[in-house]
């Protein structure tokens, strides 16, 4: 298995995985240009796990500055592994790459948002050393 940064030609396969991950309606507006913008942004990072020319998982995160911290923070935006590759270390390897890159960027902390019912994910993140920190609130605009 290879972990690498995503490239523009990964768009079609990545969007198929996104649709499996969250459903088509949520990301139907994410087009090739938007994907390109994310890949070209200095504050966004997309890693893919590839096995025999097939993308089997991905992790995306962003880096930003906030007033309360001297150094930037990183936030995991998405982590997804296709079902047949789960429990094989793919997610852990993707997260190790995210953490390595965040450290290279001198990030102070990595934040992860997770749905409160996603107990399998919570156990996964806790096994990687993350702690439940609080609540996230959202409002669609």
Give, region by region, the residue ranges found by the protein language model.
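A short, internal acetyl-CoA/4′-phosphopantetheine-binding micro-motif in the GNAT/acyltransferase core
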Residues: 79-86
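A short beta-loop-alpha structural element at the N-terminal edge
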Residues: 1-14
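Active-site rim helix/loop that mediates acceptor-substrate recognition in acyltransferases
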Residues: 27-46
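Conserved beta-strand in the GNAT
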Residues: 48, 54-63, 80
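Helix-loop element at the rim of GNAT/NAT acetyltransferase active sites that forms part
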Residues: 15-29, 67
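Conserved active-site alpha-helix within GNAT-family acetyltransferase domains
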Residues: 92, 116-134
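Conserved GNAT acetyl-CoA-binding A-motif
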Residues: 103-113
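Conserved acetyl-CoA-binding loop-helix of GNAT-fold acetyltransferases
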Residues: 87-100, 127
């Amino acid at each position: 298995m290879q972990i690498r940064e995503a490239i523009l030609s990964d768009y079609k396969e990545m969007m198929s995985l996104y649709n499996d991950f969250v459903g088509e309606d949520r990301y139907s507006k994410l087009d090739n240009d938007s994907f390109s913008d994310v890949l070209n942004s200095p504050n966004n990072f997309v890693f893919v796990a590839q096995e025999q020319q097939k993308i089997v998982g991905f992790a995306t995160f962003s880096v930003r500055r906030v007033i309360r911290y001297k150094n930037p923070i990183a936030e995991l935006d998405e982590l997804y592994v296709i079902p047949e590759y789960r429990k094989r270390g793919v997610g852990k390897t993707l997260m190790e790459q995210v953490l390595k890159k965040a450290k290279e960027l001198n990030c102070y902390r990595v934040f992860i948002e997770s749905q409160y019912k996603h107990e399998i994910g919570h156990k996964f993140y806790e096994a990687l050393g993350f702690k439940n920190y609080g609540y996230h609130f959202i409002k669609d605009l």
